[in-house]
């Protein structure tokens, strides 16, 4: 259950308003994902039921956090919301649009809707850059040049600020839970295009 336990920080994030209202919270989460992706993701019911039946580690940690007053809503409800969110099905196209929305300072390039405050974009991108590939994050940034977030479902979403979002999907994972083929695909494209978030333009002073 090592991979699943990594998401307990996200359980904490499930404490969105309104407190105590699971349906209201879930609607807020789905609406936000829909605005980011430009279309609604779908809950994979079979995966949700399977995860719910086996997430004992996360459940224990959630109640431990509650004991230390670090979860301010019902821990079982918070964990259920997190598990549901982890069981959402999303296409590579939707994931690319999500990345493009972040790269475009919160403005969805397809719907032209401002999804979140543009001031949050660099904060979101920096979080993706620093933890997106778990223990392989440094290696990924060094070799690919693009901040990216990976998921244990086999998806990888890259964010090139001011330029684009890019994604790839392939289920086989490496030892850190990152898609092997999706990494190679995005890395190849970025290197082929010569795009790197760390590239700088030289300023010539005359």
Language-model features, listed with the residues they occupy:
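Single conserved hydrophobic/aromatic residue that forms the stacking wall/gate
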Residues: 1-12
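Short, charged, amphipathic alpha-helices and their helix-cap/turn boundaries
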Residues: 5-6, 21-42, 64-69
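Active-site-proximal helix/loop microenvironment
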Residues: 18, 43-111, 115
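Conserved active-site and cofactor/substrate-binding residues in soluble primary-metabolism enzymes
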Residues: 24, 28, 56, 60, ...
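Non-transmembrane alpha-helical segments in soluble domains
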Residues: 30, 34, 62, 96-99, ...
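Structured C-terminal helix/loop/strand segments within mature extracytoplasmic catalytic/sensor domains
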Residues: 102-206
């Amino acid at each position: 259950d090592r991979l699943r336990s990594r998401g307990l920080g996200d359980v904490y994030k499930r404490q969105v308003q309104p407190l105590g209202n699971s349906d209201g919270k879930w609607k807020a989460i789905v609406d936000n994902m829909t605005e980011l992706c430009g279309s609604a993701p779908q809950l994979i019911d079979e995966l949700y039921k399977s995860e719910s039946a086996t997430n004992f580690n996360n459940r224990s940690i959630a109640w431990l956090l509650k004991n230390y007053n670090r979860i301010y809503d019902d821990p079982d409800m918070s964990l259920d919301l997190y598990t549901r969110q982890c069981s959402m099905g999303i296409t590579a196209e939707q994931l690319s649009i999500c990345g493009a929305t972040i790269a475009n300072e919160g403005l969805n390039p397809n719907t032209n809707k401002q999804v979140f405050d543009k001031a949050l974009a660099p904060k979101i991108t920096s979080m993706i850059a620093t933890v997106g590939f778990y223990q392989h994050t440094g290696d990924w940034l060094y070799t690919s040049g693009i901040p990216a977030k990976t998921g244990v479902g086999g998806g990888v979403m890259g964010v090139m600020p001011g330029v684009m979002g890019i994604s790839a999907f392939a289920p086989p994972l490496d030892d850190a839970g990152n898609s092997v083929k999706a990494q190679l695909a995005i890395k190849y494209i970025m290197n082929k295009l010569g795009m790197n978030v760390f590239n700088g333009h030289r300023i010539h002073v005359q």
